Regions:
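Compositionally biased terminal segments of proteins
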Residues: 1-157
């Protein structure tokens, strides 16, 4: 499974990360369809370089011709002028294998927790943290997720 490959590769590089998005919701018990695996890292070049290496080790390549150094140096421009919120990776031999590293969030400012899955302890953003992210994004799928997260947090789900 792609998630396990990524986590194992990140762990082998000693990279701190937080799983966010649809896979994180699934680990919190809120299952929904998603194509990609989303992560947040600490916003520093060394971490983005480790992620680039770790993802490359499992056959994933940046969708855009940019490197970790570019992301960190030009982050503000990418977000404000190019509407780029994530650094996307794909396995061109199997395009269903997709990973997004959000460049709008900093792991140092996030609340996370460890969830045990398949013999691994995966670092996941808390439901409250995911809720904040979803409220900021406000896309149609996010609005559905917001309702489900609030129900789960209130004990209704």
């Amino acid at each position: 499974m792609l998630l396990y490959e990524i986590v194992d590769s990140f762990e082998s590089q000693k990279l701190d990360y937080a799983l966010v998005g649809g896979y994180a919701l699934a680990l919190h018990g809120l299952v929904r369809a998603t194509m990609d695996v989303d992560f947040v890292l600490t916003l520093r070049q060394s971490d983005f370089e480790l992620a680039e290496k770790a993802l490359g080790n499992i056959g994933l390549k940046s969708r855009l011709p940019i490197r970790a150094e570019d992301i960190i140096k030009m982050r503000k421009e990418y977000i404000e002028q190019r509407n780029l919120i994530a650094w996307s990776f794909v396995d061109y031999s199997n395009p269903s294998r997709q990973v997004d590293i959000l460049i709008t969030k900093d792991l140092k400012k996030m609340k996370t927790q460890k969830i045990s899955v398949a013999g691994r302890k995966i670092t996941v953003a808390t439901l409250q943290e995911i809720l904040k992210m979803k409220e900021e994004a406000g896309r149609p799928q996010d609005l559905i997720d917001i309702t489900n997260i609030k129900e789960k947090l209130s004990g209704k789900k």
